[in-house]
Amino acid sequence: MEVVIITGMSGAGRSTAAHVLEDSNWYVVDNLPPAMLLPLIKEVEGEHQKVAVVIDVRSRAFFEELAQSRAALKQMQVNVRILFLDSADEILVRRYEATRRPHPLQAGDRIFDGVTRERKLLGDLRATADIVLDTSALNVHQLGNKIGEVFAQLSDRGIHLSLLSFGYKYGIPYDADFILDC
């Protein structure tokens, strides 16, 4: 079994990474507390070979729980990797300004203050991560491609093409992107 723990700075692309892995047939769980990681893996062990978990580690207790869970999984012969997504502070601030959402650690201060607090809290986790990916210069599509490169065994999704014959009197297919009348 392969387990990827997706974590990192808020706004660096954790959700995007989770979506990419989910589209590549990984079993993905978002916002899982670190204490629930081990029970989850035991629950899905026979059903899924590839599991990705998005964990938000913003407290010391969560970091210690994650370290314990990771050690327990390695004892169970589970291949566990931590993917830490990072980005430059000014980029994170710009992303939060664009979405007009407050940073989770902002606490009434400036967005930059929240980013600084989070970077301080996640410093130890970044140091222990197996893969650190800087998303500063990446857009959503480039991040998806980069995740695909990092996890080379991802299926090549390529282009999906369906040809369908239909009659106009029955209506146009709802999921059609292009319709040719020949």
Where are each of the predicted segments found?
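Switch/connector loops and helix/strand junctions flanking conserved nucleotide-binding motifs
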Residues: 61-63, 89-96, 104, 122, ...
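Conserved phosphate-donor/acceptor-positioning beta-strand/loop module used by diverse small-molecule
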Residues: 76-100, 133-134, 176-182
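The conserved Walker
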Residues: 10
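Hydrophobic anchor at the beta1->P-loop junction of P-loop NTPases
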Residues: 6
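C-terminal accessory "lid"/substrate-recognition subdomains
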Residues: 113-182
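Post-Walker A alpha-helix
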Residues: 17-18
